[in-house]
Structures are given as C-alpha cells and as structure tokens.
C-alpha cells in the first residue's frame, strides 16, 4: 500500500523540518563525532553523535535550504560518542538562537567567529543527564532562516578526571501544529 499523505514542502514524515549544517566551529575528523550527525537520524553510540573536543562551547548553524520557517518545538536527542563514553560528556546546556537575515552566510571558514553574526536567543535547555529525547515547546513560533545551536559545558567535574568533550546526538526542529 502506497502512503499518499502529502506533507508541506520541507517537512519530514516525523513532522520535523529538513535541515542541513551550514557551519560549525568545532567538528572532528572521525565520522563518529562529525557535526553532520546532528541531522542524520542515527541515535546509536559509535556513529551518531556530534562530539566537540572543547572545554567550553561548540556552535553549529543549521538552515532550511534557504527558506524561512516557523519553529515552534525543538527536540534534542541526548547520547554520547562511543561505547566507553560516559553520560557526563553530554552538553549541560544547549542554547538555540535564530536569524532571519543572510548574515550567517558570512560564516565560511574555521577562523570565522559565531559572535560576528547577530542572533536572537530562542531558548535554553538545561539538559537532564540521561539518554533520550528532551523537548521544548516555545510559547510562540519563531521565524528562522538559520538556527544556531550552542553546546555549553558538560557534566564532568573540573578536576584531574575532567574529560574535554561536549556531546549530543540529534537536533530536530518542528513547525506549529
């Protein structure tokens, strides 16, 4: 039986928007930890995580293939890199920003600075340290042509056992309704 359900342009069968990675200030050579893992629907360890070897923050910019969309819900799947990874490597905070201008297109090189672009803060997740989905439904939908995802800190203690990785697995953005 063929599924004849028609979806709005740019919306996936799970109801989330199609997105692509425009830019990231931290990514790794190992595909296990690539920033593109944020949008690949792989929720497993050993291949489905954005792992940033950073002690402070990691940023990436997603877009909607040049379109402006209304975003009402943001979901994050929390998982860490490989079998030996510990949940303390999860990002402790995730802040989401939006832009409706083409200013983020200035971000082209590793040396570019995310704060050279004007962003509007949309929400901040205080992450619960466990594997699985965590969502925020916004009070009002926001217009966005670009979405900035900022991972901040991790749950590790700041002593000799500190592990300098900030990780999460998947980001999904949803329209109203």
Residue ranges and their predicted role:
Residues 1, 40-111, 130-177:
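Aromatic, loop-rich ligand-recognition surfaces of beta-strand-rich domains
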Residues 31, 119, 129-135:
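Short, surface-exposed linear segments at secondary-structure transitions and domain or protein termini
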Residues 14, 122, 128, 139-142:
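A general, composition-driven signal for non-globular sequence regions
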Residues 2-40:
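Predominantly extracellular/luminal regions of secreted and cell-surface proteins
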Residues 108-124:
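Local beta-strand/beta-hairpin segments that build beta-sheet-rich folds
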């Amino acid at each position: 039986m063929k599924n004849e359900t028609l979806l709005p342009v740019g919306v996936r069968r799970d109801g989330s928007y199609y997105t692509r990675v425009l830019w990231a200030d931290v990514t790794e050579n190992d595909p296990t930890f690539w920033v593109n893992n944020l949008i690949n629907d792989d929720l497993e360890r050993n291949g489905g995580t954005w792992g940033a070897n950073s002690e402070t923050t990691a940023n990436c910019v997603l877009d909607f293939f040049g379109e402006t969309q209304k975003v009402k819900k943001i979901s994050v799947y929390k998982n860490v890199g490989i079998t030996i990874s510990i949940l303390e490597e999860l990002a402790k905070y995730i802040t989401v920003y939006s832009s409706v201008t083409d200013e983020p297109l200035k971000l082209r090189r590793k040396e570019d600075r995310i704060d050279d672009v004007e962003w509007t803060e949309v929400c901040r997740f205080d992450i619960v340290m466990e594997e699985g989905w965590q969502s925020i439904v916004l009070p009002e939908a926001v217009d966005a042509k670009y979405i900035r995802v900022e991972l901040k800190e991790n749950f590790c203690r700041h002593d000799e056992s500190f592990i300098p990785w900030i990780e999460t697995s998947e980001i999904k953005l949803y329209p109203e309704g």
